[in-house]
Curated annotation (Swiss-Prot):
Its cofactor is iron-sulfur cluster. GO terms for biological process: iron-sulfur cluster assembly. Required for insertion of 4Fe-4S clusters for at least IspG. Disulfide bonds: none annotated. Belongs to the HesB/IscA family. Iron-sulfur cluster binds at residues 42, 106, 108. It comes from Wigglesworthia glossinidia brevipalpis. One of its GO terms (molecular function) is 4 iron, 4 sulfur cluster binding. Keywords: Iron, Iron-sulfur, Metal-binding. It comes from the Bacteria. GO terms for cellular component: cytosol. This is Iron-sulfur cluster insertion protein ErpA. InterPro entries: FeS_biogenesis, FeS_cluster_insertion, FeS_cluster_insertion_CS, FeS_cluster_insertion_RrpA, HesB-like_dom_sf.
Length: 114
């Protein structure tokens, strides 16, 4: 398990609380909160957030006090220095990333380019 300070990655209190609630509701206690980046969206890359029980050799298990997050090595390089947050609005509730490495982002905050 690695410390979040190593990657200068931050998790807001809103995001931490939502992750805790999702994991508490999950019947499979082996699942962890995973963040990964894939090709897609309107800017080339998009953020993905899932509950996943599989942890691969190249994954990093990062501890934020009492919340663990799994991020694969390739995705992590795009997230260094970022802030993972959560918003709950009338029309939409979602996780999003404030990413200082992104050159452009879409208006919804789910995709970016480097």
């Amino acid at each position: 398990m690695e410390n979040n300070k190593l990657f200068n990655l931050k998790l807001t209190d809103l995001a931490k609380n939502k992750i805790k609630n999702l994991l508490k509701e999950e019947k499979n206690k082996n699942k962890k909160f995973r963040i990964y980046i894939s090709g897609g969206g309107c800017n080339g890359f998009q953020y993905n957030f899932i509950l996943d029980e599989k942890i691969n050799k190249e994954d990093h298990l990062i501890l934020f006090l009492d919340v663990e997050i799994v991020i694969d090595s390739i995705s992590l390089q795009y997230l260094i220095g970022g802030v993972v947050d959560y918003k709950e609005e009338l029309l939409e509730s979602c996780f999003f990333v404030i990413n200082p490495n992104a050159k452009t982002t879409c208006s919804c905050g789910t995709s970016f380019s480097i």
